């Protein structure tokens, strides 16, 4: 009977028909668009450029505060202090490696990890996490504001005791009686002033700074304060703040004077603990210090033995591919290379690095074309290889003659830095396979003196073996006087 009563309502509800969907939902509208999902080809000059100059703001992590705690027991009614010291803040470290080649992966603001606070049972706070930034080999550090970076020694900073604050627990109490009494009788206002001064000295921080990446020179920059030229080399650019003292260490410090001993006889530790808790925020002993701050300008100067310098579309990238296993981007238009490319040329008992520098034009020192900022990458090179286009200006075509190209290249190097062209040099006469290039080569040898000229065809790899031997002789040196291309040795008229 009860089963029939349960089935009847279910049948009654099932008699209702489900609402049908409206026609516009049964037949959805299909939208069409003329927009193609296929992405268009990116223009050549829209390629991401190399970021070889970067402004970095670094700040060390904050130190942890000391703990104010009391351990009580049946035998000790008032208890004993057992608060631990705060941990030391994390550092900001720069490490050079072959894994990166520019500063595109860096963030403009970086801060070390915050340290942990001390806890009861005399436990020390955790040390802040170090922030390690990877930079390419050849990074030069310019200091705008802050402390000078220091090189990391073999001993890691993590091995140091975080409670090892300079001049706190290692002093002889007997030799500092007068100073201890003076510290105990200081007023609260004097303590606040001392705390503020100590924090200011510890920070060494700028008040206001513009952290955008400009090309403008700043007046108060300390140039070349540090360089990273070896794999795995590390430099600390911002140190973490020291941790504050817990009431265990603070009590030991107070007990070091005779005045404090007489005071302790009259007052118990509980009253001292209450006073310490009330002045916790104002106490410079128990509060952790802030980390140091610095504003740095990072600049990349690639380390290469040979620098390929030439006008746009002279065939430098193709030549680099013929000399080494590098695969730079090659195109039939000017300014194909937007970033320096590096390649290794290996011999049986010798190896050297060749850098392909983006093309230079006349007036590059006035920021024409790609400018001359990339020339900093050849400041460390031993040899300059001037790559000229023999086919330029032939048969009424537009372009400069090879000797005019050499004159403009030497002038742009000197405009960038005086004496930059005064190093071992040779000339690479590229595109020797073009019609009329042989006569142009003879004219080039007549107009340019004092430097060896190597005719090559980078596409067909003709003359590349002789060029490798010439580069090896200049890089290796062997005590022989090197040849230098000078402006007075180029006859243009």
Curated annotation (Swiss-Prot):
Biased composition (Acidic residues): 187-196
GO molecular function, one term: GTPase activity
Record's keyword terms, sorted: GTP-binding, Mitochondrion, Nucleotide-binding, Transit peptide
Span of domain OBG-type G: 304-476
Residues reported in the UniProt entry to bind GTP: 310-317, 356-360
Its biological purpose: May bind GTP and have GTPase activity.
Family membership noted in the UniProt record: Belongs to the TRAFAC class OBG-HflX-like GTPase superfamily. OBG GTPase family.
PANTHER family cross-referenced by the UniProt entry: DEVELOPMENTALLY REGULATED GTP-BINDING PROTEIN-RELATED, MITOCHONDRIAL RIBOSOME-ASSOCIATED GTPASE 2
Entry protein name: Probable GTP-binding protein OBGM, mitochondrial
Organism: Arabidopsis thaliana
């Amino acid at each position: 009977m009860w089963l029939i009563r349960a089935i009847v309502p279910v049948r009654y509800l099932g008699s209702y028909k489900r609402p049908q969907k409206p026609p516009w939902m049964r037949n959805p509208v299909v939208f069409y668009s003329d927009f193609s999902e296929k992405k268009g080809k990116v223009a050549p000059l829209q390629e991401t450029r190399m970021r070889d100059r970067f402004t970095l703001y670094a700040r060390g992590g904050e130190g942890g505060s000391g703990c104010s705690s009391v351990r009580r027991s049946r035998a000790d009614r008032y208890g004993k202090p057992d608060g631990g010291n705060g941990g030391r803040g994390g550092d900001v470290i720069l490490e050079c490696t072959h894994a990166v080649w520019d500063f595109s992966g860096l963030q403009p603001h970086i801060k070390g990890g915050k340290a942990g606070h001390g806890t009861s049972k005399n436990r020390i706070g955790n040390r802040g996490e170090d922030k390690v930034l990877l930079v390419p080999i050849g990074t030069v550090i310019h200091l705008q504001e802050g402390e000078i970076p220091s090189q990391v020694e073999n001993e890691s900073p993590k091995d140091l005791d975080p409670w090892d604050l300079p001049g706190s627990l290692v002093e002889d109490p007997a030799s500092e009686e007068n100073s201890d009494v003076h510290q105990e009788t200081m007023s609260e206002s004097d303590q606040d002033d001392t705390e503020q001064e100590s924090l200011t000295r510890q920070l060494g921080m700028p008040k206001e700074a513009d952290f955008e990446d400009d090309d403008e020179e700043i007046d108060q920059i300390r140039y070349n304060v540090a360089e990273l030229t070896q794999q795995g080399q590390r430099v600390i650019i911002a140190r973490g703040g020291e941790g504050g003292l817990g009431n265990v260490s603070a009590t030991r410090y107070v007990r070091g004077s005779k005045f404090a001993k007489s005071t302790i006889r009259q007052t118990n530790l509980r009253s001292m603990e209450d006073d310490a808790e009330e002045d916790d925020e104002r106490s410079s002993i128990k509060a952790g210090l802030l980390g140091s701050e610095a504003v740095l300008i990072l600049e990349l100067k690639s380390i290469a033995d040979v620098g390929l310098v030439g006008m746009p579309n002279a065939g430098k990238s193709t030549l680099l591919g013929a000399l080494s296993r590098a695969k730079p981007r090659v195109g039939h238009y000017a300014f194909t290379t937007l970033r320096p490319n590096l390649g290794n040329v290996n011999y049986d008992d010798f190896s050297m690095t060749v850098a392909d520098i983006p093309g230079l034009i006349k007036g590059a020192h006035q920021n024409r074309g790609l400018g001359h900022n990339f020339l900093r990458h050849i400041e460390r090179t031993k040899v300059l290889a001037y790559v000229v286009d023999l086919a330029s200006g032939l048969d009424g075509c537009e372009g400069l003659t090879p000797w005019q190209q050499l004159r403009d290249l030497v002038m742009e190097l000197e405009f960038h830095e005086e004496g930059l062209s005064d190093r071992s040099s040779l000339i690479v006469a590229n595109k020797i396979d073009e019609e009329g290039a042989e006569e142009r080569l003879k004219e080039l040898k007549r107009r340019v003196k004092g430097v060896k000229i190597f005719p090559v065809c980078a596409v067909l790899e003709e003359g590349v073996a002789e060029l490798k031997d010439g580069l090896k002789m200049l890089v290796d040196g062997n005590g022989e006087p090197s040849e230098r291309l000078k402006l007075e040795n180029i006859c243009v008229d």
